[in-house]
Structure formats: structure tokens, C-alpha cells
Amino acid sequence: MICGIDEVGRGCIFGPILSAAVVFKKKPNFIKELDDSKKLTKEKREYLSSLILENSYYAFGEISNITIEKINIHNASLLAMQTAYENLKLNCNLVFIDGKFVPKISAKNVKAIIKGDSIIDEIKAASIIAKVKRDKLMDEYDKIYPLYLLKKNKGYPTKEHKNAIKKYGVLSLHRKNFKLI
């Protein structure tokens, strides 16, 4: 069994960092359509996400902005990946991680792959479902905090988002140790 893990939200100034772990039940017929989530349109990501969820074992790991502030974004990213793998509750022979650092994972063989979200199909799939899940979370927060344009910026430090912080203040879900806040 091969597992791919990726995270999303590392560069955000609002909300959690979210990670996904994916193991395909069998090689899916849509495998050639997979790519790094950042290279796909929103519509394509959502379409592929539903296919991935139907055809794989998957789990998520979510680390709050408060924990990010306590342990830093690097450690929070590793913890999110570790949590996603633990939540998967499978013993995988091989786990591919997007990036250059390996979280504490109890699998036999764990490999960090730089740009893995463009190379390894399981990481591509994890990238897609993590991005779709976090984007939907930001859409929900946008309903609560519409002045911060979270539906548009997804928690990233856009000019509009930074201007909203200056005008309306920092929210409890902002990452306060981020340099821009």
C-alpha cells in the first residue's frame, strides 16, 4: 500500500494548516488528470476531489492557528501530516511526503519528495483533497467574517486581506506571529 501526504495553508495568515493522506483502493482511471492542486482550476479540483474521495482511503490532519503560534509553522506542518497518517489507520509499506522533511510516521518506508505534488499520484491526490477541504472551510469563515474576503483570498496575505486587518483588526483565527500581523 502506497500513501501520499500533502499539506495546504502553510503560507496563510488565517486559519489552520490542513493535511491529507491518500491511499488509492486501486489505480483509478482518472490518474492522468491528477496534478498539483495549485495548477488546477477550482472546478477541476472539486471534480477530482469527489473522484478521489470515492476511490481511495483518506484522512485529514488539521492544526489550529493557536498551535501554529505555539510550535511554529514548520512543526505544525509536520504535525498535520503525522496526524493525517495516524487518522488513516492503515499500515502502509511506503509513504511519500511532499517536501523535504519527514514527519514522525510509523510506516516502514517514508520518503520526502521535493515537488512531490507534481510527481507522485498519491501526493497529487492528497494535495487536491486538502486544498478543496481548506477552501470550503475558508468559504464558511467568509460568511462569518465577510469584511476579510476569505472566500476570495482563502486566508493568504493578499493586499485586500492585509488592508482588512488594518481597517477592522486581527481576528482570533489570524496567525498572530506571522510577520504581516
Swiss-Prot record:
A divalent metal cation binds at D6, E7, D98. Its EC number is 3.1.26.4. It catalyses: Endonucleolytic cleavage to 5'-phosphomonoester. It is found in: Cytoplasm. Pfam families: RNase_HII (PF01351). InterPro entries: RNase_HII (IPR022898), RNase_HII/HIII (IPR001352), RNase_HII/HIII_dom (IPR024567), RNaseH-like_sf (IPR012337), RNaseH_sf (IPR036397). It comes from the Bacteria. One of its GO terms (biological process) is mismatch repair. Keywords: Cytoplasm, Endonuclease, Hydrolase, Manganese, Metal-binding, Nuclease. Transmembrane segments: none annotated. Gene3D superfamilies: Ribonuclease H-like superfamily/Ribonuclease H. Its cofactor is Mn(2+); Mg(2+). GO terms for cellular component: cytoplasm; ribonuclease H2 complex. Manganese or magnesium. Binds 1 divalent metal ion per monomer in the absence of substrate. May bind a second metal ion after substrate binding. It is an enzyme of class 3 (hydrolase). GO terms for molecular function: manganese ion binding; RNA binding; RNA-DNA hybrid ribonuclease activity. Residues 1-181 form the RNase H type-2 domain. PROSITE patterns: RNASE_H_2 (PS51975). Endonuclease that specifically degrades the RNA of RNA-DNA hybrids. Belongs to the RNase HII family. This is Ribonuclease HII. It comes from Borreliella afzelii (strain PKo) (Borrelia afzelii).
